[in-house]
Each structure stands twice: as structure tokens, then as C-alpha cells.
């Protein structure tokens, strides 16, 4: 047992433990930056979206079924992760840059939020050129709600998104729930269906604007004849 008295034995042991810990940390960091641990989104059916209850944000709110948003002319809808998030404000501004083209197509632009805290929606409105509604039951964030917790802060893609939005001049706050991931939908008129469904996979994972515009061009507005069918 003389080797136990050899200082080099303990030094080598500590180096081995340290190397093992570093290797495990490196592997964890590597896996955290892949999609291995990301929850897979469950696609929403049109019938699921149609039945969602939304509320207007007036002093006397009106509750209505979400299908009213797209029944006649289709719609582009942003499910906002958190109005105070500067990444969400960046995406809202990006979508709003399509507003004039969407207007030419006759397709409205909307957003839904999952909570209405103090002036958060009011402060978000300058970034978004469309009406905003409240989805209290968070249905637009389902059918299977997905969360990104603190793992998001060790993902390189998230940090890239942070710097991109920051360099773009966007700022925000930490008010409200921000772990349930959002998304963007392009829904056709009537029973045309969901033409685009983008589910945020990490903080700041923005929808492709060209894809939104291409999907919006596929919308076929309801006519009196089609409404009677």
C-alpha cells in the first residue's frame, strides 16, 4: 500500500477527476446546443385553434372564438412569448414590416398574449402593427405547451439571438411569464386550414418572413358563395 503514500498518486487522481468533470461539462454543453433535449412541438389542428376563447383588451372585454380572426380573410397570428421580451419585440417589428404587403392581400395581422400585466401590452404595441388579444388559457401555445428554462442561457443560438436583437436597438424587461414558447401561424379563410405553423424552439427563434408572405399569398378569401356551402 506504499503507493497511497506517494503524492503523485493523489495528484494523478485529482487530475483524472478534474478531466472527467471537464469532459462531462463539455458533453453537457454540446448536447444542450443540439435539439436532443428540446421538447418536440405537437402540431395544432384547425378545429383546435377555432375553438380557442380569446378576449379583447378593452375596459369591458368581449370574449369570442378565435376562428373569427381568420374566418373571412385568413390571418397571420403571432403567439407572443412575453410582451416585455426584447426578442419578442424584435419579431413583432419584423412581422409588422410585412403589414403593407399583407394589407394588399387583404390579410390581417394579429397577436395573442397569455397575460395582461400592467402596461406590458401597451408598451409592446409600438412594435406590433396589429390588434392584440388575450389568450388566458394559453391554448395558442399548445396543444402541448413547451417550455425552455435555464438551459436556454447556455445555448449558443440564444446568445446569438440576444446580440442580434440588442444590436438592432431592441430593449425590454423581465415582467411576466417567459418560459412557455410562442410561435406564428398563418391560417387560411374558412376551412382552408393552417398554412404555416412556426413553433419557437428556443428564445428568439424567429419565423422566416418570406415563408409568412408565401403562406399569406395562398389564402383564398371567403366569398358569399363559399360561405353558404
Curated annotation (Swiss-Prot):
* Source organism, top-level taxon: Eukaryota
Keyword terms, alphabetized: Antioxidant, Cytoplasm, Redox-active center, Secreted
How is this protein annotated for GO cellular component?
Answer: cytoplasm; extracellular region
Active-site feature positions: 85, 88
Q: Can you cite a GO biological process for this protein?
A: regulation of osteoclast differentiation
What does this gene product do? Involved in redox regulation of the cell. Acts as an antioxidant. Inhibits TNFSF11-induced NFKB1 and JUN activation and osteoclast differentiation. May affect bone resorption and help to maintain bone mass. Acts as a negative regulator of macrophage-mediated inflammation by inhibiting macrophage production of inflammatory cytokines, probably through suppression of the MAPK signaling pathway.
Other remarks?
The active site cysteines correspond to the redox-active cysteines of peroxiredoxins.
- The name this protein carries in UniProt is Peroxiredoxin-like 2A
Give the organism the record lists: Homo sapiens
Gene name in the database record? PRXL2A
Amino acid at each position: 500500500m506504499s503507493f497511497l503514500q506517494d503524492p503523485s498518486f493523489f495528484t494523478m487522481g485529482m487530475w483524472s477527476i478534474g478531466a472527467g468533470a471537464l469532459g462531462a461539462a463539455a458533453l453537457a454543453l454540446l448536447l444542450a446546443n443540439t435539439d436532443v433535449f428540446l421538447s418536440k412541438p405537437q402540431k395544432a389542428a384547425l378545429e383546435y385553434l377555432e375553438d380557442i376563447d380569446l378576449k379583447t383588451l378593452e375596459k369591458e372585454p368581449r370574449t369570442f372564438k378565435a376562428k373569427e380572426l381568420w374566418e373571412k380573410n385568413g390571418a397571420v397570428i403571432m403567439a407572443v412569448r412575453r410582451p416585455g421580451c426584447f426578442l419578442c419585440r424584435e419579431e413583432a417589428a419584423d412581422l409588422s414590416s410585412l403589414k403593407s404587403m399583407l394589407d394588399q392581400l387583404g390579410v390581417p395581422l394579429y397577436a395573442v398574449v397569455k397575460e395582461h400585466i400592467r402596461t406590458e401590452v401597451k408598451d409592446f404595441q409600438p412594435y406590433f402593427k396589429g390588434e392584440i388579444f388575450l389568450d388566458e388559457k394559453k391554448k395558442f401555445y399548445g396543444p402541448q405547451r413547451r417550455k425552455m428554462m435555464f438551459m436556454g442561457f447556455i445555448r449558443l443560438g440564444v446568445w446569438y439571438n440576444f446580440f442580434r436583437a440588442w444590436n438592432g436597438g431592441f430593449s425590454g424587461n423581465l415582467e411576466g411569464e417567459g418560459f412557455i414558447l410562442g410561435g406564428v401561424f398563418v391560417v387560411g379563410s374558412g376551412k382552408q386550414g393552417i398554412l404555416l405553423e412556426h413553433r419557437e424552439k428556443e428564445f428568439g427563434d424567429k419565423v422566416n418572413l418570406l415563408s409568412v408572405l408565401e403562406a399569406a399569398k395562398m389564402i383564398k378569401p371567403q366569398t358569399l358563395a363559399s360561405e353558404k356551402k
